[in-house]
Structures are given as C-alpha cells and as structure tokens.
Amino acid sequence: MNSRQEREEILVKNIFNNIKAYFVNINRHKKITTQKSIFVVLDTETTGLDVNEGHRIVSIAGTKIKNLKITNEILDELVNPECQISERSIEIHHITQEQVENKPALKELDNKIYNFLEDTVLVGHNLNFDIKFIIKSAPYTTIAHRVKNIVTIDTIYLAAGIYPHFKSYELSFLCENLKIQTEDQTRHSALGDSVITARLFLHLLEEASKKNVTTIGGILHLCQQGKQIQILMKDFNKIH
C-alpha cells in the first residue's frame, strides 16, 4: 500500500470516527434533562465579520450554567488575533491592537478553553459564527475538534421555536421584548453578551418547560423547528 493510499484511508477513518463520536455524544445528551445539564454560553469578538477574509478572534468569553442557574465560573480572555483589527470592529467592541498585541493567540489558550468546555452543552446566539471563528483561529487544536463535536444550542433557533411569531431574533430585540436584564452588562463585549445570552437562554428554558420540554433532546427539537422558521423568513424576505 502506498503512502498516499494510507493517508487517504486514515483520513476516511478519522472522518468516520468523528461522525460516530458526534452522534454518540448527541444521543448521550438527548435524554438528559436541562436541570442536570451543564451549559457554557459562549461569545466572541472578532477583527471583522468574514472569517474567510482572514478575520480572527480578539476576545472569547463563556458563562457556565449549572442547575439552571448562572454560576460564577467564567472564561474571559483577550486574544492576539495575529492580524489587524478593522476600524469598524474597534468602534463596536472597543478592543484595540495595543490591548491584544501581547496577549496569547487562541491556540495558546487551547487547554484552558477545552477544560472549560469539557462535559458541557455549548450555547450561543448565532453560535455558528463563533464556532467558525474558533476553528479558523485555532486549527488542529483540541478546542477546534471539541466545538465540531460538542452538542450545541443556538438561542436564535430556540427563540424562533418558542416564539415563531416574532419579527426579529436579534439579541437586543429579544431582550427588550422578553424583559431580559441587560443594563448591568457591556454590550458587544464577549463577557457581557455571554451573560446576557445566558439570561435569555434560561428564560427560553423556562418557557420550554411550560410546553413540557425538559430534556436536551426536546430543546434540540425546538431548535430544529426554529431553524425551519428562520429559513422560511429568509425566503419570504427574498421574495418580497
């Protein structure tokens, strides 16, 4: 067997093992109640909005939820993006080049972030944005592998599944309409938005429980319904 064939077989095997591990992880969590689950609500700030244009993470934060309560366990790190921060992004999150130039790159925080995420369900608002940036900012690391295989809940989809009639699922709109406290947090900071999203998430879990949805599997089903609503809303906006 030549080396190219061996590499291809190893690649296929690794892909298969990753897919298998993902579904084993999903199935393991499906029957677990939200009460017994540990959640990490994640948020990032970046140098720009397009990961494919070379934009990277400048700040990452996580808020841990246990027993359906926000804990004091937090992750809050400035990150050296190893590239320039756009002026537009600085206007939004107020993180300057000077603040991050001596901070660790995301890959250097690999163990710290991985340990924080271990045995948790990952939550975020437009979470796929954060996941893509983590994978691009720290490729071939344990955290990149972790976020590819972890159970995830996007509060956009969960909110759409519970409140299908809302005209928007933007974080500020949801917090205003659902009376989620935000005044004590700094918006567009990774930690501030993480805490606010955690509060929103707990509200959504409470509303889900009123529909007798109390397992991770049930929450994922609501998210899937919400995702379909999001797709329909986008299609409707394209038509009109």
Features from the language model and the residues they span:
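Short alpha-helix plus adjacent loop in nuclease-associated cores
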Residues: 152-168
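Acidic, Mg2+-coordinating catalytic module of metal-dependent nucleases/exonucleases
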Residues: 121-128, 132-133, 137-138, 170-232
